[in-house]
Amino acid sequence: MADRVIEELDEDESLRLISAGGIGRIAYQSRFGPAVLPVNYKWYDGAVVFRTARHSALDEDLQTGIAGGDYLVAFEIDDYDTAGRQGWSVMIQGPAHHIESEEARERAKQAGVEPWAPGDRELFLRIVPHRVTGRRIKPA
């Protein structure tokens, strides 16, 4: 008999779990193939908001993909208790966009996302969810 169960989370519960912000992973098609990078994020104004450096590998890959259309990415956030063998994960899928206008950047700064990575990280990006899914593993 299994001692764990997996529960599918609805969108509201998934968004509640990620609303505090933290560290998530952006998955996208880079010029070298599929890539997954951890970034500090905040949930703000109905979107995942994060920062990166101009001309970084992430910026260059996304600039190429974003130009002229929606560049679809996945963003994954999770929290686990390895000793208790339980936790949850949420995946957001949708287009990534640079936050271009000064007004929009000022609003995004209000989200308070602070990258751990050193250096100038003044390029703001957002992912607007088209699909939100989540799962929780817990004791049976």
Question: At which residue positions do the language-model features occur?
Answer:
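Extreme N-terminal tail/first-helix region
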Residues: 1-19
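Charged, gly/pro-rich active-site loop segments
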Residues: 2-3, 73-140
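Short connector loops at helix/strand junctions that flank enzyme active sites
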Residues: 19-21, 36, 43-45, 67-72, ...
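Short beta-strand segments
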Residues: 21-54
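Short acidic/glycine-rich loop or secondary-structure boundary segments that cap or lie
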Residues: 36, 49-51, 58-60, 84-85, ...
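Compact nucleic-acid interaction/catalytic patches
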Residues: 44-65, 73
